[in-house]
Curated annotation (Swiss-Prot):
It catalyses: L-tyrosyl-[protein] + ATP = O-phospho-L-tyrosyl-[protein] + ADP + H(+). It is an enzyme of class 2 (transferase). Residues 1-19 form the signal peptide. Homodimer in the presence of bound dimeric VEGFA, VEGFC or VEGFD ligands; monomeric in the absence of bound ligands. Can also form heterodimers with FLT1/VEGFR1 and KDR/VEGFR2. Interacts (tyrosine phosphorylated) with LFYN, NCK1, PLCG1. Interacts (tyrosine-phosphorylated active form preferentially) with DAB2IP (via C2 domain and active form preferentially); the interaction occurs at the late phase of VEGFA response and inhibits KDR/VEGFR2 activity. Interacts with SHBSH2D2A/TSAD, GRB2, MYOF, CBL and PDCD6. This is Vascular endothelial growth factor receptor 2. The second and third Ig-like C2-type (immunoglobulin-like) domains are sufficient for VEGFC binding. The record marks Y1173 as: Interaction with SHB. Expressed in endothelial cells (at protein level). Detected in embryonic endothelial cells, as well as hematopoietic stem and progenitor cells. Detected in vascular endothelium. Expressed at high levels in adult heart, lung, kidney, brain and skeletal muscle, but is also expressed at lower levels in most other adult tissues. The gene is Kdr. Tyrosine-protein kinase that acts as a cell-surface receptor for VEGFA, VEGFC and VEGFD. Plays an essential role in the regulation of angiogenesis, vascular development, vascular permeability, and embryonic hematopoiesis. Promotes proliferation, survival, migration and differentiation of endothelial cells. Promotes reorganization of the actin cytoskeleton. Isoforms lacking a transmembrane domain, such as isoform 2, may function as decoy receptors for VEGFA, VEGFC and/or VEGFD.
Length: 1345
């Protein structure tokens, strides 16, 4: 038996060990065993607590206020012995009251545990402060059915605890029912009992000692939800693949917990993301905000439907919903019901709505007659066009263009607005409503009517004067109930004829209706009535026939009180009798006949009869009413009545008598002292008033001043004028105004400065000499202008923007008809502060200035002001005004020098205000940056290589570049710079720009911007004609601007015009068809753009270096010889130059293609430099192609290693990927290689020195002996003009510059106003002119200087 027992014990031990090692299921495990068998253990403070736990698996201890083994006071150790291999002992030495709580021993991976609650009896700290008290905050609700637990647990189980609340203070004692205290839980009571309190605490008494728990702040938790708002609030439209974001915002009362739930359409893909968070409320709001965001990164058609956001606080639920519509792709279309014609009456409000179906919402732009419309105080632009008070000027064609911002699809619709104007009669505003006509005379009555649309009809009516009511004081004093047609003139005046004349004047329909009265016999009223669909207009004419009495006032028309006044009524004594005076008093206005007032003559009995004195002469009877010492009560309306001897009919005349109140003299304002010089004129006015009119007397130094030679008194002595003042005219002058009521005085001091006046003889001699000199000077000017002037039909178009078609209007008339909106462009001269001159020309100048308030973004802006010099002629003034109008016509673009304003009002010089580019022209800038050029700048190693590369430039190369550019000209604008632009900019804030290195990226960026600007000018149908680096200005942030496009010509118009004399043209930049056939097109500008690229990538070198501009040069250029690659270019850029230099203009790329190509090249360079993108100083966004077909050299070192690629003489092959823009080009073939001017050795030309002020870069050097040869060869060569749609007759010798635009110097010498040439240049001009003459058979005149 003993052995069996031992075997059983061993077997149990193995099973237990196996179960522990492999782990038994939870159903087979027994809870761990604790060393104490009690559920509650009570120990004293400062003793040691030790509990051992044994079990069948790995064990862990948990104790109050701690997480596992995180507290250093608590010691958990492995224990041995006993009947279990898994054993842990928890030991806490010197326990305190806060150690009271549940101690739990559990298996590590199974939720099976044993717990003992330990009281550490500490009478000094009977309440436990544990971490589970949530920092002393108790959350409650005001629900009566809810209870709240204040967690003031005790270290002693049988405490007598009460709850204290404040404020106000209140105590709660356990009642064994709803209010209780449990040492393991805390104090429990209904929450509403302490909802008023701010804080609570538990209190207990032990041995007459009172102990308190920690303070608990009472926080009342709310439930109210004010609103739930969805954003966007309206129906949402998206296209497939777009991102959907719905924000659901809930506003609640404070201390509310909120749960969000979203209800959305079922979707196949699980791609919805919901994020909930609290939102910080706005300051001052008593509300809490919660936000739930639903996001779908890429919506599909299945995501379409209703989305509902539900917010719940437990007791309250609110929701909001929206509908999401998903389109398969963006679209745009006009809806049905769009009108094409809208009619409105002048003065009314007009609305032109736009109905469309689109996703996304389109960009809406309105245009009126092709010009964009912006919102202002009269027009509101948006989804509908609203014109507040339509006028005749608002009529026209309105076009709305809708643009889909994603697909960029455009839809347009035009609406014609017709403004109808009711008939307006012009004479109503000009003629008094009561007119008098002599008896028996023929009279003509006229109505001039303006109306739109034309009148339906215009009719004349009449009525006898006595048949109409009389309303004194009214604008139309007569009112007639019935009107008779003029054809029924029985009882009235006989009508001889009526006729209507129609005309269309300035877009207005004008109708003149005439009524001819054969004899004025009867006083009547005539009415002309005009009617059209917009309304009606009428004019009533009082045709008052005079053959009766006349009234006059003596002695004055407006007498003053206390003067003797007489009213005289004069009548023909053979016709009239019984003359009587009446006064029209207040009682007359109360007499009625029916409903209308009666005429005066029908109501004489109601008037106040006056006594008068009768006088007679051979023809007239005169009845006089005299007022001695007239008073204000005497004024009023007086009626003179006379009876016809034959008909006994009474005729009445009304006269209003006005008596002015007496007023003592008064001088308003003070006379100011005046200081002048001898020989000038002094004028002073004495502003005196009074009744009777005061008599004015002037005194000088208290002596009466009388009129004398040079002293003039006018306007009743009010105005004093002293001409040709002398020294003795100085002194104290007194103005005295007197009438019967007194006098008033005012004084002024005249101070005369300067030397004593010369004698009259000396004055006569000086005046005579001046007159003779003026005569000879005018004669000389007339002679010179006759010699120099072109004939009358010519205008100096060299500085105009557009040359018009000669088959239409003359150029000057066409330019003058261009609009100039003074309200938009006029700028006050007093807000313009002129500074230093920037350039000057033969008749004009450019001045730097500060404009105050010309730009809304800045108080003061630096601008450039173009203005004429003193003595400019009328034609020059008209030319500058024409350029101003054309600059407005061209419009605004970032890469052109834009118009800012103008000063055109009389009283000062004509000024054209344009943008100021502080860094000067691009050619000068590039030459100044040669020593600072590095191809790449982004990486440190490459940057250092770039500096080394620049440093290793050969001295010979730099000397050659300096030699090439030493004779560079300034520009073709007609203005010679006062000093070099580099000197000017050193004085300005250019240090920031010049201190940076110049990179290949900069050069490509400059090229790209010029192409953008030329693309804009081409879109405006303008040709530049002088595109070169000297005409490109550099502004802030590396923005380049094209100037001198004032030289541009309108492509719609014929650019042919003939100039006299010799002038310089920039031959090095001109296309062959321009040189030989004078054909100027956009494609010839593309050739010039290629030369400009060469200038940029040679850092400002002069084109065709070392090449003599002679007959051989012209021949080789025509045969296809081109310039070598510049020293700093890439293969791609040189290929672009060759594309621009194609001999067939139609095969050259357009500027739009160049923009795309250079944009790709710029992006590729930026990526090669380590950038993902490049920020361009442009207003438009550049879209880059991934594969631009570009292969740039990786660094200057690689460029030097691959000498065959970087060699300027290298001939580039026609590879397919070399230029992306050629994929859609008209080009069918391209030369495999290009001959350059360096392929054939050239003899060094003889350098001819030309004065600096007339030096140019045009390269026009040709020996006179070569003229004949080139002329003969040109006759045999095909003409370039056959390739072009139009052909210019302009001489190559015509001016190639705009003389009023830009800051650069032109081809004229400012001192002599003539052009200075070398003999070679003059020869070339004559040679080319002769060649074209032989080719075209056209006789050319020499252009003016």
């Amino acid at each position: 038996m003993e052995s069996k027992a031992l075997l059983a014990v061993a077997l149990w031990f193995c099973v237990e060990t196996r179960a522990a090692s492999v782990g038994l299921p939870g159903d087979f495990l027994h809870p761990p065993k604790l060393s104490t068998q009690k559920d509650i253990l009570t120990i004293l403070a400062n003793t040691t607590l030790q509990i051992t736990c044994r079990g069948q698996r790995d064990l862990d201890w948990l104790w109050p206020n701690a997480q596992r083994d995180s507290e250093e006071r608590v010691l958990v150790t492995e224990c041995g012995g006993g009947d279990s291999i898994f054993c842990k002992t928890l030991t806490i030495p010197r326990v305190v009251g806060n150690d009271t709580g549940a101690y739990k021993c559990s298996y590590r991976d199974v939720d099976i545990a044993s717990t003992v609650y330990v009281y550490v009896r500490d009478y000094r700290s009977p309440f436990i402060a544990s971490v589970s008290d949530q920092h002393g905050i108790v959350y409650i609700t005001e629900n009566k059915n809810k209870t709240v637990v204040i967690p003031c647990r005790g270290s002693i189980s049988n405490l007598n605890v009460s709850l204290c609340a404040r404020y106000p203070e209140k105590r709660f004692v356990p009642d064994g029912n709803r209010i209780s205290w449990d040492s393991e839980i805390g104090f429990t009571l209904p929450s509403y009992m302490i909802s008023y309190a701010g804080m609570v605490f538990c209190e207990a008494k032990i041995n007459d000692e009172t102990y308190q728990s920690i303070m608990y702040i009472v926080v009342v938790v709310g439930y109210r939800i004010y609103d739930v708002i969805l954003s966007p609030p309206h129906e949402i439209e998206l296209s497939a693949g777009e991102k959907l974001v719905l924000n659901c915002t809930a506003r609640t009362e404070l201390n509310v917990g909120l749960d969000f739930t979203w209800h959305s359409p079922p979707s196949k893909s699980h791609h919805k993301k919901i994020v909930n968070r609290d939102v910080k409320p706005f300051p001052g709001t008593v509300a809490k905000m919660f936000l739930s965001t639903l996001t779908i990164e890429s919506v599909t058609k299945s995501d379409q439907g209703e989305y509902t956001c539900v917010a719940s606080s437990g007791r309250m639920i609110k929701r909001n919903r929206t509908f999401v519509r998903v389109h398969t792709k963006p679209f745009i279309a006009f809806g049905s019901g769009m009108k094409s014609l809208v009619e409105a009456t002048v003065g009314s409000q007009v609305r032109i709505p736009v109905k469309y179906l689109s996703y996304p919402a389109p960009d809406i732009k309105w245009y009126r007659n092709g010009r964009p419309i912006e919102s202002n105080y009269t027009m509101i632009v948006g989804d509908e066009l609203t014109i507040m008070e339509v006028t005749e000027r608002d009529a026209g064609n309105y076009t709305v263009i809708l643009t889909n911002p994603i697909s960029m699809e455009k839809q347009s619709h035009m609406v014609s607005l017709v403004v109808n104007v009711p008939p307006q009669i012009g004479e109503k505003a000009l003629i008094s409503p009561m007119d008098s006509y002599q008896y028996g005379t023929m009279q003509t009555l006229t109505c001039t009517v303006y109306a739109n649309p034309p009148l339906h009809h215009i009719q004349w009516y009449w009525q006898l004067e006595e048949a109409c009511s009389y309303r004194p004081g009214q604008t139309s004093p007569y009112a007639c109930k019935e009107w008779r047609h003029v054809e029924d003139f029985q009882g009235g005046n006989k009508i001889e004829v009526t006729k209507n004349q129609y005309a269309l004047i300035e877009g207005k329909n004008k109708t003149v209706s005439t009524l001819v009265i054969q004899a004025a016999n009867v006083s009547a009223l005539y009415k002309c009535e005009a009617i059209n669909k917009a309304g009606r207009g009428e004019r009533v004419i009082s045709f008052h026939v005079i053959r009766g009495p006349e009234i006059t006032v003596q002695p004055a028309a407006q007498p003053t009180e206390q003067e003797s006044v007489s009213l005289l009524c004069t009548a023909d004594r053979n016709t009239f009798e019984n003359l009587t005076w009446y006064k029209l008093g207040s009682q007359a206005t109360s007499v009625h006949m029916g409903e209308s007032l009666t005429p005066v003559c029908k109501n004489l009995d109601a008037l106040w009869k006056l006594n008068g004195t009768m006088f007679s002469n051979s023809t007239n009877d005169i009845l006089i009413v005299a007022f001695q010492n007239a008073s204000l009560q005497d004024q009023g309306d007086y009626v003179c009545s006379a009876q016809d001897k034959k008909t006994k009919k009474r005729h009445c005349l009304v006269k209003q008598l006005i008596i002015l109140e007496r007023m003592a003299p008064m001088i308003t304002g003070n006379l100011e002292n005046q200081t002048t010089t001898i020989g000038e004129t002094i004028e002073v006015t004495c502003p005196a008033s009074g009744n009777p009119t005061p008599h004015i007397t002037w005194f000088k130094d208290n002596e009466t001043l009388v009129e004398d030679s040079g002293i003039v008194l006018r306007d009743g002595n009010r105005n004093l004028t002293i001409r040709r003042v002398r020294k003795e005219d100085g002194g104290l002058y007194t103005c005295q105004a007197c009438n019967v009521l007194g006098c008033a005085r005012a004084e002024t001091l005249f101070i005369i400065e300067g030397a004593q006046e010369k004698t009259n003889l000396e004055v006569i001699i000086l005046v005579g000499t001046a007159v003779i000199a003026m005569f000879f000077w005018l004669l000389l000017v007339i002679v010179l202008r006759t010699v120099k002037r072109a004939n009358e039909g010519e205008l100096k178009t060299g500085y105009l923007s557009i040359v018009m078609d000669p088959d239409e209007l003359p150029l000057d008339e066409r330019c003058e008809r261009l609009p100039y909106d003074a309200s938009k462009w006029e700028f006050p001269r007093d807000r313009l502060k002129l500074g230093k001159p920037l350039g000057r020309g033969a008749f004009g100048q450019v001045i730097e200035a500060d404009a105050f308030g010309i730009d809304k973004t800045a108080t003061c802006k630096t601008v450039a002001v173009k203005m004429l010099k003193e003595g400019a002629t009328h034609s020059e003034h008209r030319a500058l005004m024409s350029e101003l109008k054309i600059l407005i016509h061209i419009g605004h673009h970032l890469n052109v020098v834009n118009l800012l304003g103008a000063c055109t009002k009389p009283g000062g010089p004509l000024m054209v205000i344009v943008e100021f580019c502080k860094f000067g022209n691009l050619s000068t800038y590039l030459r100044g940056k040669r020593n600072e050029f590095v191809p790449y700048k982004s990486k440190g190693a490459r940057f250092r290589q770039g500096k080394d590369y620049v440093g290793e430039l050969s001295v010979d190369l730099k000397r050659r570049l300096d030699s090439i550019t030493s004779s560079q000209s300034s520009a073709s604008s007609g203005f010679v710079e006062e000093k070099s632009l580099s000197d000017v900019e050193e004085e300005e804030a250019s240090e920031e720009l010049y201190k940076d290195f110049l990179t290949l990226e900069h050069l490509i960026c400059y090229s790209f911007q010029v192409a953008k600007g030329m693309e804009f000018l081409a879109s405006r149908k303008c040709i530049h004609r002088d595109l070169a680096a000297r005409n490109i200005l550099l502004s802030e942030k590396n923005v380049v601007k094209i100037c001198d496009f004032g030289l541009a010509r309108d492509i719609y118009k014929d650019p042919d015009y003939v100039r006299k004399g010799d002038a310089r043209l920039p031959l090095k930049w001109m296309a062959p068809e321009t040189i030989f056939d004078r054909v100027y097109t956009i494609q010839s500008d593309v050739w010039s753009f290629g030369v400009l690229l060469w200038e940029i990538f040679s850092l400002g070198a002069s084109p065709y270096p070392g090449v003599k501009i002679d007959e051989e040069f012209c021949r080789r250029l025509k045969e296809g010889t081109r310039m070598r690659a510049p020293d700093y270019t890439t293969p791609e850029m040189y290929q672009t130059m060759l594309d621009c230099w194609h001999e067939d203009p139609n095969q050259r790329p357009s500027f739009s293609e160049l923009v795309e190509h250079l944009g790709n090249l710029l992006q590729a360079n930026a990526q090669q430099d380590g950038k993902d993108y490049i920020v361009l100083p442009m207003s438009e966004t550049l879209s880059m192609e991934e594969d631009s077909g570009l292969s740039l050299p990786t660094s200057p070192v690689s460029c030097m290693e691959e000498e065959e690629v970087c060699d300027p003489k290298f001939h580039y092959d026609n590879t397919a990927g070399i230029s992306h823009y050629l994929q859609n080009s008209k080009r069918k073939s391209r030369p495999v290689s290009v001959k350059t001017f360096e392929d054939i050795p050239l003899e060094e030309p003889e350098v001819k020195v030309i004065p600096d002020d007339s030096q140019t870069d045009s390269g026009m050097v040709l020996a006179s002996e070569e003229l004949k040869t080139l002329e003969d060869r040109n006759k045999l060569s095909p003409s370039f003009g056959g390739m072009m749609p139009s052909k210019s007759r302009e001489s190559v010798a015509s001016e190639g510059s705009n003389q009023t635009s830009g800051y650069q110097s032109g081809y004229h010498s400012d001192d002599t106003d003539t052009t200075v040439y070398s003999s070679d240049e003059a020869g070339l001009l004559k040679m080319v002119d002769a060649a074209v003459h032989a080719d075209s058979g056209t006789t050319l005149r020499s252009p003016p200087v």
